Amino acid sequence: MKKLFTVTAIGLALLTWHTSCTLQPKAPEAFTPIKVETPARPAGQEDVIQLVAPKIDTVRVGFIGLGMRGPGAVSRWTHIPGTKIVALCDLSPERVEKSQEILKNAGMLEATSYSGSEDAWKKLCEQEDIDLVYIATDWKHHAEMGVYAMEHGKHVAIEVPAAMTLDEIWQLINTSEKTRKHCMQLENCVYDFFELTSLNMAQQGVFGDVLHVEGSYIHNLEDFWPSYWNNWRMDYNQKHRGDVYATHGMGPACQVLNIHRGDRMKTLVSMDTKAVNGPAYIKKQTGEEVKDFQNGDQTSTLIRTENGKTMLIQHNVMTPRPYSRMYQIVGA
């Protein structure tokens, strides 16, 4: 036994020496924290957190974007009392016609059609008999359309994400404050039964003092990639890095942690894996090797708030996993 122990000890020593020789630490990587300052607020503007707009007896709605999500939204709105769909817009005339069929099948009047031009949406925003513009286009047009609609006297509802840069976020905020028009990001997960039940439990004190919340968007989009107009969503992931669809997890987490109602997000650290499935999918479809695919398969972001709470947000649309938002609440 003593001999075996001695041999084992020698082996461990040799392994340790070999590892120390072959796995010498590399020069430390330099990380420069990115500090984001709140820009100077325009004089005289008030926030819109508690904005109440004058009552509208019948809300007249125009839809921009009738591809992946738009037709479903049109269909749902045919069931909402006190609303009227008055305008439909898409670059493709065929898509507009398909949504007109939805109205016809619901026994509703045909809406004004806009299509055939990349600027056709502006004509919809300028149409006088519209109260609300519903935007369901590709992401890069969301903020521009929202700002233009509010500047033309319309309330705005935008599918997530409502904006892609900090500059765009502040454009939406400033325009909403200036025009006193609602600008709502249509984050549906904050209204799902599980998230609302959990929020109610948290507000009733079931979890005690909530310290940590987790959420995610885990959704393998392999079956959906071909349906996106001009391949815009895969293209965005190829050219951009990070959690590009954060609010499914972050929205419910912010509600529970009372973000902007006594607390605020202050610091984040985010990491991603290497890109594997994105480049593999493109090669499978086109036969071409992808030399530079920016977004990793999995992105994990840890956020700390001013009051010392944390949230963990994950994003993964590439790997073959079951759909999950991985919602969890940790209290003390």
Residue ranges and their predicted role:
Residues T112-D119:
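Short acidic-hydrophobic, aromatic-tinged amphipathic segments that line or gate anion-handling sites
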Residues T179-M184, C189-F293:
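Predominantly a Rossmann-like dinucleotide-binding segment in NAD(P)-dependent oxidoreductases
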Residues H18-S20:
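C-terminal motif of bacterial Sec signal peptides marking the signal peptidase cleavage site
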Residues M1-T8:
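Bacterial N-terminal signal peptides that target proteins for export
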Residues V290-D292, G296, E306-A332:
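NAD(P)-dinucleotide binding in Rossmann-like oxidoreductases
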Residues D138-W139, A143-Y191, G205:
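Beta-strand-loop-alpha-helix segment that lines the small-molecule cofactor/substrate pocket
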Residues T22-A106:
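N-terminal Rossmann-like dinucleotide-binding module
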Residues L132-Y134:
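N-terminal Rossmann-like NAD(P) cofactor-binding module of classical short-chain dehydrogenase/reductase
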